[in-house]
A protein has these predicted regions:
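General marker for long, soluble alpha-helical cores
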Residues: 1-126
Length: 126
C-alpha cells in the first residue's frame, strides 16, 4: 500500500510492539485518524464504531471520548455532525441531558452550546 512516511512510521512502531495494525493499516486513513484509532485500541474500546475513513480525525476523537465515558455515541456518531457539534452532544450526554433538544445538524455548534447550557449543562470543557 501507499503510506506516507509518518503513517508508515506509526504502523512500524505498532508492529514492533507486537500490536495489531489491521484496523487502520489502510491508505485511506490519514495520520490523525490513525492516531484516534490507535488511542481507542490502547484504551480497549470498540473502534469499529468509528474506524471509517468517512469520519475525520476530530469526529473520531469525539466518538472515542464518548465511548471512553460509556456514553451512547449512537446519538452523534453520524457524519452529518461536525466534530464541534459532536462535542456539544457528547457533553450533553455526559451531563445526562435530553440531547434531542439540540441534536440537529442544522444548528451551529455555538447554538448547541447555548441550548445545552439552558438545559442545565455544565460549562464543561472536556
Amino acid at each position: 500500500p501507499n503510506f506516507d512516511d509518518v503513517k508508515m512510521k506509526k504502523i512500524r512502531e505498532r508492529l514492533k510492539d507486537g500490536l495489531d495494525v489491521s484496523t487502520y493499516a489502510d491508505p485511506k486513513f490519514n495520520y490523525r485518524q490513525i492516531k484516534e484509532i490507535q488511542l481507542g485500541l490502547d484504551e480497549g474500546l470498540d473502534v469499529s464504531v468509528y474506524d471509517d475513513p468517512k469520519f475525520d480525525g476530530g469526529q473520531m476523537k469525539e466518538i472515542r471520548l464518548g465511548l471512553k465515558d460509556g456514553l451512547d455515541v449512537s446519538k452523534y456518531a453520524d457524519r452529518k455532525f461536525d466534530c464541534m457539534q459532536m462535542r456539544e452532544i457528547r457533553l450533553g450526554l455526559k451531563d445526562e441531558l435530553d440531547v434531542s433538544e439540540f441534536s440537529d445538524s442544522e444548528l451551529d455548534y455555538k447554538e448547541m452550546y447555548h441550548l445545552r447550557l439552558e438545559l442545565g449543562g455544565s460549562k464543561n470543557i472536556k
